[in-house]
Design a protein with these regions (language model features):
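An amphipathic, aromatic/His-enriched active-site/gating alpha helix that lines ligand/cofactor pockets
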Residues: 31, 35-44, 61-96
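Intrinsically disordered, low-complexity acidic/polar segments
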Residues: 21-23, 55, 67-69
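Helix-centric, low-specificity signal for extended rod-like, repetitive segments
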Residues: 6, 26, 39-40
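Short, surface-exposed ligand-recognition loops at beta-strand->loop->(often short) alpha-helix junctions
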Residues: 15-28
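Glycine-rich beta-strand-turn "strand-cap" elements at beta-sheet edges
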Residues: 1-8, 14-17, 47-57, 80-103
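Short coil/turn motifs at secondary-structure junctions
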Residues: 17-19, 51, 63-67
Length: 103
């Protein structure tokens, strides 16, 4: 198996706003995946998970911290980013960041 040389992950945990359906949220997620992020330098991918309590977790994978930090201000100016953000309960949101360590 090929070893990844560098990776930085961003974990975002959150709940949806009251009244937002799973279908609305997944449609917004699909728009993110098919949008500008595909061309963003250092972007490796993103995965989405849902817990049994209804909360969500998105794991974004980047080449490094700088690539992740460059995306954040861009994301919030995009139409799809604003639509996505409008569905989240930001009071429930938590972010964590990790850098891959290869022993």
């Amino acid at each position: 198996m090929e070893q990844i040389k560098s990776q930085y992950i961003e974990l975002v945990r959150f709940n949806l706003k009251a009244g937002v359906t799973t279908e609305q949220f997944l449609s917004a997620e699909k728009n993110i995946r098919g949008g500008a992020i595909q061309k963003q330098a250092g972007y490796q991918g993103r995965d989405i998970y849902q817990d049994v309590d209804g909360s969500w977790l998105i794991i974004l994978r980047w080449d490094n911290k700088e690539a992740a930090e460059a995306w954040t201000p861009i994301f919030m100016t995009l139409k799809e980013g604003q639509a996505f953000g409008s569905l989240l309960d930001f009071s429930s949101a938590r972010q964590e960041h990790y850098t891959l360590v290869n022993p």
